[in-house]
Amino acid sequence: MTKKVWKFYGIALLAVVIDQVLKLWVYFNMQMGTLGQIKLLGNWFKLFYTLNPGMAFGIQFGFTYDKVLLTIIRIIATSMIIKYIWNLAKETNSSKWLLWGWSLILGGAAGNGIDSIFYGKILHNAPYGAPMSWFYGQVIDMLYIDLWSGRLPDWVPWYSGYYVTCLPVFNLADVAILAGVALIVLDKRASIQQPVQKYEATEVTDSELLETRHELVDPITEHNNTEHNHPEVEDK
């Protein structure tokens, strides 16, 4: 069992290592913004170095100490996932895809958590005005699918003139989290379909058994009816 658990912890660790290697490469080799972008697939897919002070895909809570709360949530969530994988791996009939999914989520959460906890101090990328360097690191994002970007027209309420992109810039940790969620959803759908198939198979089996029972009962009934129609004549 221990070997099985560490196998999936190893998957999470591999996701963290790959994520951190790419982030550090971007940090030391790329210029932030449009001037430093690297086109990988024409104008559609690029490496675009940017910093994200919030959660995955740039989501933020929007108050002064949201970064501290976010980091605490990441630490708690990571600890809970570690424990959950341990318990799940101990089950003899645990799904491999479910373990893969949670391992990828663990790797993604830990990868972005490292940025939040350490990068503000080590890479000095904490936002201006942050009360401390620790726990205020900004997550390094670099993967950009450029489907559309531009400024919203003036007639758009509340957000007129804002520069927006169709998809936010993300990183490999975000990809790992999304892939993990997808595997869990697929596993759940498969587990829902299996009982239905099993029930249908049981219905067929019960039907066959009922038919067999009728075949066994009918000769007995016919024999009883014959005796009833032709009673024995008593000797006088």
Curated annotation (Swiss-Prot):
Keywords: Aspartyl protease, Cell inner membrane, Cell membrane, Hydrolase, Membrane, Protease, Transmembrane, Transmembrane helix. GO terms for molecular function: aspartic-type endopeptidase activity. It is found in: Cell inner membrane. The active site is at 141, 174. It is an enzyme of class 3 (hydrolase). The chain crosses the membrane at residues 8-28, 44-64, 68-88, 98-118, 166-186. It comes from the Bacteria. GO terms for biological process: proteolysis. It catalyses: Release of signal peptides from bacterial membrane prolipoproteins. Hydrolyzes -Xaa-Yaa-Zaa-|-(S,diacylglyceryl)Cys-, in which Xaa is hydrophobic (preferably Leu), and Yaa (Ala or Ser) and Zaa (Gly or Ala) have small, neutral side chains. This is Lipoprotein signal peptidase.
